[in-house]
């Protein structure tokens, strides 16, 4: 069972109060995951050359602008196939300074909200990072394909939206592509502020980072376990 399968199971556990009465639905959802679609989405994201936060925003073929517009279009296509069940929009903020910010820039997150049937203001967030970079975090011109870090996580989020949007859940699900992660977690900070301003009751967050990597630093290959990366972040003290 792949990591994406585990992620979808976790979503069901958090988002459905009567999970154990719906075993058949859970397994149907798992069976719908398509590795071919995920690979296709990763390939598409890589094709933009670089998705660096400071890269081209005008071109339709290269840079962070082209990548985020493609992701938004994919969410809109998914929504059109579920009777407009997703609210798709950009959430943006203007960043003027930072150790990895060479010039002021807009940070765009791509958001798609699937409303819950019982608790529409209770949210589970599933995110993937849009941006990529090479070893030099200030180099926004050279190619940085970022297939694993983090086209894999973004593709996983899109695939989850494709599948879960076909079903109804008690709580709302937010699928989001975050920008500015490599430059200082700017997209995540912006979404947190937006969530507070909007009065969201966030009950769970799953950020998919490098889900395409199944080989550890010790050479052990394992696609049945989670590797947890986290750091303390005191939300209330910063945004309350």
Q: Which residues are covered by each model-predicted region?
A:
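Bacterial Sec-dependent N-terminal signal peptides
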Residues: 1-23
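Second-shell loop/turn segments in exported
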Residues: 24-33, 51-63, 97-101, 139-150, ...
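Extracytoplasmic/secreted proteins, especially bacterial periplasmic and envelope-associated proteins
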Residues: 25-29, 33, 37-40, 44, ...
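Structural recognition of the beta-strand scaffold that forms the well-ordered cores
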Residues: 29, 37-47, 54, 87-90, ...
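Solvent-exposed loop/turn segments at secondary-structure junctions
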Residues: 50-53, 94-98, 117-119, 130-134, ...
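Alpha-helical metal-binding/catalytic segments enriched in His/Glu/Asp
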Residues: 112, 126, 130-132, 136-184
